[in-house]
Swiss-Prot record:
Pfam families: HSP70. Belongs to the heat shock protein 70 family. SUPFAM superfamilies: Actin-like ATPase domain (SSF53067), Heat shock protein 70kD (HSP70), C-terminal subdomain (SSF100934), Heat shock protein 70kD (HSP70), peptide-binding domain (SSF100920). The keyword Nucleotide-binding applies. This is Chaperone protein HscA homolog.
Length: 617
């Protein structure tokens, strides 16, 4: 006899069975994988007992090498050994060459403008390189856990934009992984820290990794993680310490000629080793080519002081966004290997006036938090134990007539979120509408960041203002934006998923936020002027059409002249920048045409009732 196993919809046939899920910290310098076993979240080691996998991929003639072995080949085979690929994710070739001119790779540009790296195995893109790192981590997890993974949570910097997040998802798909969620790195750290220590209150998560910096201000209360504000820089990290130090060594060695790719990699490797050594020593002797010298911790601190100060400026902005002071912060959590640098810990401690918490390994805390979240999302733990509220860093809006920005989703709104707003047509008979998606805090489109454009066609021809177009902005849990425009009477709609072609650094974010405050008054004046100009255009076009259609039938020549003079006066002031003059011109045109409007209304009613009896009416 055969038995049919029955289970509740959406549940496992064996609900007691533990599903295998992991959290992956896909870092710029190093990557880790962690999982929850027997209620404890721990990072998973490789066969040699190492939990950290260097984020390095080497392409050899007959195989691909990932991790420590690949890193050892960086100096001898720099063109085929890809390091810090996370920095390249979602960026254009032009952007990469501007930001990182010293990279030893042979780049070419693909048809879509994205970078391709030439290796001995052919051309590869950053997504393919990242996929190799993810494959290595997932293989390690499956060997350690003894089964196939049902899902993964992958962490990303809070300031990764849509293209960078989408690229990370694509890399996971290429690696054969089921992505349960992309999780902001500081939020993952908060999960690990909050659950392990049972803290409640305001916590600052200071995350300085190899290639990115993030600061998150979070409120932890009764298992609820709410991100009050985020800040940071997607192009600042320990790698920059290495570059500054390598430049100092070049200057000391009086090297003026260009270095070969191999020499450049050797220099960066030397700088990295020197930086690590200075975390525990007051001075280190270094040698490069024919030069040998000593660098002290004080010199190193001076070299990186401006970079550390940039992180503290981001902390200040995040606190201001959260509307709290540094005194309100209960604890400061340090995340990322670069926070081991003594001057970083001292500077952060001085700024927040408290000793930063380092009880959880700063290299492992993000992976541990991701593992806890993965364990919940895969169904091993009731998700009611924790609520996670991320936020979007910059407002999302739409361009309206006059080059104005109508904000749909304000910055620091918790995600996932969906918001809709209705718009209408500007001209009679308009059958299409261009939807321009913009990002930023300014009032005018020209001062914001353009994300995407798409057209909605098939709008039924109607009088201006009669059509109703509903525009919906939806940001999912991974921070990806989808925009839909629908004409309500017909249901015709158009849709786009926004994927910018390059990243948005915190310097640009900070500039956009600073400008929105600096130019707030000017922006409001510009907006008021643009609004009056749009209204003037509407009045002018409406009166011109009305006069052409009904002027001779309903008005005398003298009456037409009065209205035309008002229209011409409005056209004249419309060209200027005096908001009040335009408003007065609109008012004068309205007053001059009131009788005309009344006669048109009467004529329309008579035409509608012509031939009908009182009973029919």
């Amino acid at each position: 006899m055969a038995f049919l196993q029955i289970s509740e919809p959406g549940q496992s046939a064996a609900p007691h069975q533990h599903k295998l899920a992991v959290g992956i910290d896909l870092g710029t310098t190093n990557s880790l994988v962690a999982s929850v076993r027997s209620g404890e979240a721990n990072t998973l080691p490789d066969m040699k007992g190492n939990v950290i996998l260097p984020s390095v991929v080497q392409y050899q003639d007959d195989k691909i090498c990932v991790g420590a072995n690949a890193y050892q080949s960086a100096a001898s085979d720099p063109q085929n050994t890809i390091i810090s690929v996370k920095r390249l994710m979602g960026r254009s070739l032009k952007d990469i060459q501007t930001r990182y001119p010293d990279l030893p790779y042979q780049f070419t540009e693909s048809d879509n403008g994205l970078p391709v790296i030439h290796t001995t195995q052919g051309d590869v893109n950053p997504i393919q390189v990242s996929a190799e790192i993810l494959k290595s981590l997932s293989n390690r997890a499956e060997v350690t856990l003894g089964g196939s993974l049902e899902g993964v949570v992958i962490t990303v910097p809070a300031y990764f934009d849509d293209a960078q997040r989408a690229g990370t998802k694509d890399a996971a798909t290429l690696a054969g992984l089921n992505v349960l969620r992309l999780l902001n790195e500081p939020t993952a750290a908060a999960i690990a820290y909050g659950l392990d220590s049972g803290q409640e209150g305001i916590i600052a998560v200071y995350d300085l990794g190899g290639g990115t910096f993030d600061i998150s201000i979070l409120r932890l209360s009764k298992g609820v993680f709410e991100v009050l504000a985020t800040g940071g820089d997607s192009a600042l990290g320990g790698d920059d310490f290495d570059h500054v130090l390598s430049q100092w060594i070049k200057d000391q060695a009086e090297i003026t000629t260009a270095l070969s790719n191999q020499e450049q990699r050797e220099l960066l490797t030397l700088a990295t080793e020197t930086k690590v050594a200075l975390s525990d020593a007051d001075s280190v002797t270094v040698s490069f080519k024919e030069w040998s010298g000593t660098i002290t911790a004080d010199i190193f601190n001076q070299l990186i002081q401006s970079l550390v100060k940039k992180t503290l400026m981001a902390c200040r902005r995040a606190l201001k966004d959260a509307d709290i002071s540094s005194e309100d912060v209960m604890e400061v959590v340090m995340v990322g290997g670069s926070t081991r640098t003594p001057i970083v810990r001292r500077s952060v401690g001085d700024y927040f006036a408290k000793t930063p918490l380092t009880s959880i390994d700063p290299d492992q805390v993000v992976a541990i938090g991701a593992a806890i979240q993965a364990d919940i999302l895969v169904g091993n733990k009731p998700d009611t134990e924790m609520l996670l509220l991320d936020v979007i860093p910059l407002s999302l809006g739409i361009e309206t007539m006059g080059g104005l920005v109508e904000k749909i989703i304000p910055r620091n709104t918790t995600i996932p979120v969906a918001k809709a707003q209705e718009f209408t047509t500007f001209k009679d008979g308009q059958t299409g509408m261009m939807v321009h998606v913009v990002q930023g805090e300014r009032e005018m489109v020209e001062d914001g960041r353009s994300l995407a454009r798409f057209s909605l066609k098939g709008i039924p021809p109607m009088t201006a203002g009669a059509a109703h177009i509903r525009v919906t902005y939806q940001v999912d849990a991974d921070g990806l934006l989808s925009v839909t425009a629908m004409e309500k009477s017909t249901g015709v709609q158009s849709h786009i998923q926004v994927k910018p072609s390059y990243g948005l650094s915190d310097n640009e974010v900070a500039t956009m936020l600073k400008d929105s405050m600096t130019y707030a008054k000017d922006d409001m004046k510009a907006r008021a002027l643009a609004e009056q100009q749009v209204e003037a255009d509407r009045v002018i076009e409406g009166l011109v059409v009305a006069l052409n259609n009904d002027g001779d039938a309903l008005l005398s020549k003298e009456e037409q002249t009065v209205i035309l003079q008002a229209v011409e006066a409005l056209i004249t002031v419309r060209k200027g920048t005096d908001t009040q003059a335009i408003e007065d011109g609109i008012k004068h045109a309205d007053e001059a045409s009131q009788e005309f409007a009344a006669r048109r209304m009467d004529a329309s009613i008579r035409a509608a009732l012509a031939g009908q009896s009182i009973d029919e009416v």
